[in-house]
């Protein structure tokens, strides 16, 4: 009795499985698959983008180096302007110093001439009859006028033996007008006349 029931159960299971297989075959039969399409599905490869050999690669080190190079070029391009401005300033200072030096040298170049702090020029001469004491000749606007005043006084005192600033002009010019107010020109002339009383020298017609 038990064996009959077991066999009937097995038959029922087999029939059920067969029905499922038939249904599945019929369902798949409804689809018409192209053989080439199905084979192509197995041949599809995953698309991986290839990197071009010339494409740039973002390297942090190369980016930093490029930035430093650009900064160095910009600083080097601006440095000539700074150097040119500093060199111009140094040149101006050198020119000013050279001009001041030339003015001082020119003022000292003439015998018996001293430059005043305010820019004018004083002329004076030493009197050999008074142990080399100085005789003030006046203050003049230019060093040349002061030098001519000295030459006139020296020519009166020492004659042609005098050492002059302008020896070729001896006796040609009168002494320039004194621009100072400390002493009158007549007083200076009288003092020179007194100092040359013991000497015989020709008078200065033009200085």
UniProtKB/Swiss-Prot annotation:
Its main location: nucleus. GO terms for molecular function: DNA-binding transcription factor activity; transcription cis-regulatory region binding. Residues 74-87, 197-207 have a biased composition (Low complexity). Keywords: Activator, DNA-binding, Ethylene signaling pathway, Nucleus, Transcription, Transcription regulation. The keyword Transcription regulation applies. The keyword GTP-binding does not apply. InterPro entries: AP2/ERF_dom, AP2/ERF_dom_sf, DNA-bd_dom_sf, ERF_plant. It is found in: Nucleus. One of its GO terms (cellular component) is nucleus. Pfam families: AP2. CDD domains: AP2. Residues 70-101, 171-207 are annotated as: Disordered. Residues 109-167 bind DNA. One of its GO terms (biological process) is ethylene-activated signaling pathway. Belongs to the AP2/ERF transcription factor family. ERF subfamily. Probably acts as a transcriptional activator. Binds to the GCC-box pathogenesis-related promoter element. May be involved in the regulation of gene expression by stress factors and by components of stress signal transduction pathways. This is Ethylene-responsive transcription factor ERF106.
């Amino acid at each position: 009795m038990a064996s009959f029931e077991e066999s009937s159960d097995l038959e029922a299971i087999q029939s059920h499985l067969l029905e499922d297989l038939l249904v599945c075959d019929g369902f798949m039969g409804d689809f018409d698959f192209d053989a080439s399409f199905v084979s192509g599905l197995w041949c599809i490869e995953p698309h991986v983008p290839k990197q071009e050999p010339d494409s740039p690669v973002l390297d942090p080190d190369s980016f930093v180096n490029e930035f430093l190079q650009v900064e160095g070029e910009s600083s080097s391009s601006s440095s000539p302007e700074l150097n040119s401005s500093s060199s111009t300033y140094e040149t101006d200072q050198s020119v000013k110093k050279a001009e001041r030096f030339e003015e001082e040298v020119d003022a000292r170049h003439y015998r018996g001439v001293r430059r005043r702090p305010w820019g004018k020029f004083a002329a004076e001469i030493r009197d050999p009859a008074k142990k080399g004491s100085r005789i003030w000749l006046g203050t003049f606007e230019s060093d040349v006028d002061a030098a001519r005043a000295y030459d006139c006084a020296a020519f009166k005192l020492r004659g042609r033996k005098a050492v002059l600033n302008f020896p070729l002009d001896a006796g040609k010019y009168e002494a320039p007008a004194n621009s100072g107010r400390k002493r009158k020109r007549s007083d200076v002339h009288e003092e020179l006349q007194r100092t040359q009383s013991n000497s015989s020298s020709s008078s200065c017609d033009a200085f």
